[in-house]
């Protein structure tokens, strides 16, 4: 009985640790599009670290990501849905006794993967390109059902205890490392305002909008997107043509163009696009349309 109680305490601690990690991660993902545009070096650094650290997590394609604050998120809409589902499941587990028992069933957890798989497979094999709404919805559903089932099987209804505080304390070194890394990265990163000034020094005749392109999207994902031809977007087209070792930590693109039309992410009208290395501020490429 004592060993069983110890095992239960360990699982409860793991639950709280995962819950806090997912909460911090999701919070950063949502705020990153705003932070990356900040002139404050620390806030900019936090946003930059979020984009850079997710190169192994996601393809980071802007055309498959949600837009917040005029900027695309560090991970795609499907991944955002998955993590949001995990977060909601953790919250819901505190009230599991009041929720329908069907949510705890193993078959629902298994079936929840089907919509996610169908949505991804039909796109992978080129039948059609799924929408951000379907990506987010299927990710949210699968993330919630699987996580809610796992919590109820291995942990049960969680309770606030000393393990809650212990999990928070374990998280503090991670937050300290994140802050320290953000200060370091932010001190060398070019701000959106700096890039706008650089672009205006070249072209001051047209309104200029500045966007951030995540590292993996710039280096490989955009040019490998088989649905790129379906977009009337000059920026995406330009990125697919750039062959440069720069941009390993992300790229700023200054778009100087008129009215856009058709299906696009950044811009599709006549004008000029200026690509800058986000770390050095070096002008990587310039295209006129």
Protein language model annotation of sequence segments:
Residues 60-77, 117-143:
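Interfacial helix-loop-helix junctions of multi-pass membrane proteins
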Residues 21-28, 103-125:
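Small-polar-interrupted transmembrane alpha-helices in polytopic inner-membrane proteins
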Residues 37-75:
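Extracytosolic (periplasmic/ER-lumenal) interhelical loops and adjacent juxtamembrane/interface segments
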Residues 162-185:
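Internal/C-terminal transmembrane anchor helices
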Residues 22, 84-91, 138-156:
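Hydrophobic cores of alpha-helical transmembrane segments in multi-pass inner/ER membrane proteins
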Residues 13-43:
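N-terminal signal-anchor transmembrane alpha helix
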Residues 184-246:
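Short, non-transmembrane alpha-helical segments in secretory-pathway proteins
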Residues 262-289:
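A short, surface-exposed beta-strand/turn
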């Amino acid at each position: 009985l004592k060993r069983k109680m110890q095992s239960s305490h360990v699982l409860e601690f793991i639950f709280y640790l995962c819950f806090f990690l997912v909460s911090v991660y999701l919070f950063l993902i949502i705020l990153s599009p705003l932070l990356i545009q900040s002139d404050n070096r620390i806030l900019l650094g936090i946003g930059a670290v979020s984009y850079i650290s997710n190169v192994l997590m996601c393809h980071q394609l802007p055309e498959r990501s949600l837009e917040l604050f005029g900027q695309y998120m560090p991970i795609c809409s499907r991944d955002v849905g998955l993590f949001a589902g995990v977060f909601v499941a953790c919250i819901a587990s505190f009230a599991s006794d009041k929720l329908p028992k069907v949510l705890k069933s193993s078959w629902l957890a298994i079936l929840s993967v089907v919509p996610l798989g169908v949505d991804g497979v039909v796109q992978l094999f080129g039948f059609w390109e799924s929408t951000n709404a379907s990506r987010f919805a299927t990710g949210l559903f699968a993330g919630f059902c699987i996580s809610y089932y796992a919590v109820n099987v291995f942990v049960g209804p969680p309770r606030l205890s000393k393990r809650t505080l212990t999990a928070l304390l374990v998280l503090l070194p991670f937050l300290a490392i994140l802050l320290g890394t953000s200060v370091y990265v932010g001190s060398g990163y070019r701000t959106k305002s700096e890039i706008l000034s650089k672009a205006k020094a070249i072209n001051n005749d047209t309104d200029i909008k500045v966007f951030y392109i995540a590292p993996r999207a710039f280096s490989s994902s955009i040019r490998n997107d088989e649905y790129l031809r379906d977009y009337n977007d000059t920026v995406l087209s330009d990125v697919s043509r750039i062959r440069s070792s720069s941009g390993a930590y992300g790229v700023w693109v200054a778009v100087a163009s008129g009215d856009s039309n058709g299906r696009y992410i950044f811009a599709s009208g006549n004008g000029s696009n200026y690509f800058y290395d986000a770390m050095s501020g070096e002008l990587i490429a310039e295209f006129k349309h």
